[in-house]
């Protein structure tokens, strides 16, 4: 790790300005940042660079979600060279590897110390309301009054479980990615993984390799290879400007914000984890879960169309990469363009699955997350 930021204080977490405290009343400060994960810490750096007095209020510890709400084998989807925060960049021995969760925690914890972030941990924000020309922030440890509030509490606080989960037979265990740690915590027997984005495909792969038969329910998804023409797909998307697209450059911002995460996994082998890879090891592929009636899960018949659309969009991305490589003189430096086999779909994917016959013992809801502003 390398940092180029010199904090005002010696190495260690920052302290609040004593002048911000009003004896016997609310604490006063310019800006309150809610959350001390990587986003909140990055905001702290930027505020400090501009001389803005602030405090970070954290309900637990720094990087709490990484410490308590991630499964054991998870690695970042992005290579180490992309792991950077304002004033801190990765400078380890393997820029093309992918951080494990302990490494992410260490990275974020170290960053908090490097920038001397003024953090108040074990502080739960209970309400935020407008007061005059500022805000009042109530917590379990007192009240703050401030000019500005930054909500950096994350976008993955609550697992989005569809309402149809209430119709699942009581004999079947249900878990979300926030609860899941490893296959050993699951019951023996078949597992239905609902959702085929990054989380769903990774968990389907891990659970199936543990010896539990897995059925994967896939709706709309984003397929991309881990490596293309000898370089990581993230390198290509960074170089071509795909990652630089602004919110005001898209036709439908709401749709853009709800595009599924790509089917990617971070591994030392840099292998592609798409639906073909999963069916190749024996995972059963079915369509989007549409409902549950009388103990039977009902699936959409649009699996083939969804897979064809994902293949089409992937090839459009690869075309963009090929054009950029040619225009920038890289064709002689990297392997030639190629295309991947289309997603293999059974002639007649099943449209129903009996949840009462004992074949399915667990359902994993890999159906996304949502923020919690309550």
Where are these regions (language model features)?
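A short acidic, glycine-rich active-site loop
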Residues: 93-95
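Short, basic/glycine-rich phosphate-binding loops at helix/coil junctions
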Residues: 83-90, 254-255, 328
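Intrinsic-disorder-associated, low-complexity terminal segments enriched in Asp/Asn/His/Tyr and depleted
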Residues: 3-8, 17
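Low-complexity, intrinsically disordered short segments enriched for Gly/Pro and polybasic residues
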Residues: 1-3, 221
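Redox-cofactor-proximal catalytic regions of oxidoreductases
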Residues: 63-89, 278
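Flavin (primarily FAD) cofactor-binding/catalytic cores of flavoenzymes
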Residues: 18-36, 41-68, 98-374
């Amino acid at each position: 790790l390398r940092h180029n930021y010199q904090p005002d204080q010696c190495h260690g977490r920052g302290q609040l300005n004593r002048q911000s405290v009003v004896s016997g009343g609310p604490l006063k400060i310019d800006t309150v940042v809610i959350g001390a994960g990587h986003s909140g810490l990055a905001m702290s750096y930027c505020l400090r660079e501009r001389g803005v007095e602030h405090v970070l209020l954290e309900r637990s510890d720094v990087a709490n979600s990484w410490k308590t709400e991630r499964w054991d084998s998870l690695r970042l989807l992005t290579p180490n060279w992309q792991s950077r925060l304002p004033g801190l960049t990765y400078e380890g021995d393997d820029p093309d590897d992918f951080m494990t969760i302990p490494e992410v925690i260490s990275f974020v914890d170290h960053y908090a110390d490097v920038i001397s972030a003024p953090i108040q941990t074990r502080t739960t924000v209970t309400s935020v309301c407008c007061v005059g020309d500022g805000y009042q922030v109530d917590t379990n440890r007192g009240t703050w009054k401030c000019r500005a509030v930054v909500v950096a509490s994350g976008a993955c606080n609550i697992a989005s479980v569809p309402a149809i989960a209430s119709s699942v037979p009581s004999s079947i265990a249900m878990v979300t990615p926030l609860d899941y740690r490893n296959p050993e915590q699951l019951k023996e027997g078949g597992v239905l993984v609902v959702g085929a984005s990054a989380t769903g495909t990774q968990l389907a792969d891990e659970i199936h390799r543990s010896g539990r038969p897995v059925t994967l329910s896939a709706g709309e998804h984003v397929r991309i290879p881990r490596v293309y023409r000898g370089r990581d797909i993230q390198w290509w998307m960074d170089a071509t400007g795909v990652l630089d697209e602004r919110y005001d450059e898209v036709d439908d911002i709401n749709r853009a914000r709800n595009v599924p995460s790509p089917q990617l996994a971070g591994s030392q082998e840099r292998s592609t984890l798409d639906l073909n890879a999963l069916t190749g090891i024996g995972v059963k592929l079915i369509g989007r879960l549409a409902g549950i009636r009388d103990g039977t899960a009902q699936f959409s018949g649009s699996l083939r169309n969804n897979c064809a659309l994902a293949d089409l969009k992937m090839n459009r991305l690869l075309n963009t990469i090929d054009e950029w490589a040619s225009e920038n003189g890289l064709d002689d430096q990297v392997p030639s363009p190629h295309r991947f086999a289309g997603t293999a779909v059974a002639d007649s994917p099943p449209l129903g699955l009996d949840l009462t016959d004992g074949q399915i013992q667990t359902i994993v809801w890999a159906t996304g997350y949502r923020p919690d502003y309550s």
